[in-house]
């Protein structure tokens, strides 16, 4: 019984770490629905995400909820 509660605590701790807001400005890409999405950052930093992404040379962009944050994703195919 004690080991299952320890396991549950570790899973809970990992979820907190993974979902916590991060100030890391590294860009990451994810493949989804036939295209690549580049994460530019928090939508609060890019209020017009679509315009920002087009200025960066991408097809466009949109703010999507990922965890507790709204992130600006630029679309690249």
From Swiss-Prot:
Residues 1-26 form the signal peptide. Keywords: Antimicrobial, Disulfide bond, Fungicide, Plant defense, Secreted, Signal. One of its GO terms (cellular component) is extracellular region. Its main location: secreted. InterPro entries: Scorpion_toxin-like, Scorpion_toxin-like_sf. One of its GO terms (biological process) is defense response to fungus. Disulfide bonds join 43-63, 49-72, 53-74. It is found in: Secreted. Belongs to the DEFL family. This is Putative defensin-like protein 30. It comes from Arabidopsis thaliana (Mouse-ear cress).
């Amino acid at each position: 019984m004690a080991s299952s509660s320890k396991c549950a605590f570790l899973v809970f701790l990992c979820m907190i770490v993974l979902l916590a807001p991060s100030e890391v400005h590294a860009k990451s890409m994810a493949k989804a629905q036939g295209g690549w999405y580049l994460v530019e950052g928090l939508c609060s930093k890019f209020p017009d995400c679509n315009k920002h992404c087009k200025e960066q040379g991408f097809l466009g962009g949109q703010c999507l909820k990922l965890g507790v944050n709204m992130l600006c994703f630029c679309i690249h195919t």
